[in-house]
């Protein structure tokens, strides 16, 4: 796991640790507005996104292309409150050799553990329900360590495969996370630990 300065920092790190120019994301319909803005910003870096019309495994599969490198959804959509079939979408993503990234902010780990349902990477905007007190901004990124990174499809992961289940986090910690200032401030980490009792 990696603690980040915000939920958006966690999502940015999660995506940019995988993506490069020419890559494609298949994303759920009805995502949080800040997420849609981020995915729109990535167009300037040659990264495109296709949004599914409905959050069904079949709808996700219909949008996958050879350039797709991430399938992304929220456990419970914000603001539509639509629920993603995490297990079904994970099976589709893995069938195509693609990691499944899930934003579990609304459900929190108290209600849903997406890793147990097949997700590969999970992020939380812990500023919201994990903190519970509205006194700190923070985000969490968790890698389940089970995704098999194909060095041909994900060339950026090649030198980190030696770390086995920690390959994704090793790449993140030795690259973007260290150089882009996304780390969580100590005071916010402290406030989150106090707020956890309200979860």
Where are these regions (language model features)?
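Conserved PLP-enzyme active-site core in the AAT-like
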Residues: 2-199
């Amino acid at each position: 796991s990696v603690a980040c300065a915000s939920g958006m920092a966690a999502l940015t790190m999660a995506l940019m640790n995988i993506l490069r120019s020419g890559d494609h994301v298949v994303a759920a319909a009805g995502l949080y507005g800040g997420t849609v803005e981020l995915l729109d910003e990535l167009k300037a870096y040659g990264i495109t996104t296709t949004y599914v019309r409905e959050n069904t495994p079949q709808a996700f599969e219909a949008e996958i292309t050879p350039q797709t490198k991430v399938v992304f959804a929220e456990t419970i959509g914000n603001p539509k409150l639509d629920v993603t079939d995490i297990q079904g979408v994970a099976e589709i993503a893995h069938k195509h050799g693609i990691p499944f990234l899930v934003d579990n902010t609304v459900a929190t780990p108290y209600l849903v553990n997406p890793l147990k349902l097949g997700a590969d990477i999970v992020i939380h905007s812990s500023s919201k329900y994990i903190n519970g007190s509205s006194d700190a901004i923070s985000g969490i990124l968790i890698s389940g360590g089970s995704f098999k990174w194909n060095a041909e499809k994900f060339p950026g992961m090649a030198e980190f495969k030696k770390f086995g289940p920690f390959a994704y986090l090793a790449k993140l910690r030795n690259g973007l996370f260290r150089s882009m200032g996304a780390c969580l401030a100590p005071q916010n980490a402290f406030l989150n630990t106090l707020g956890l009792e309200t979860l």
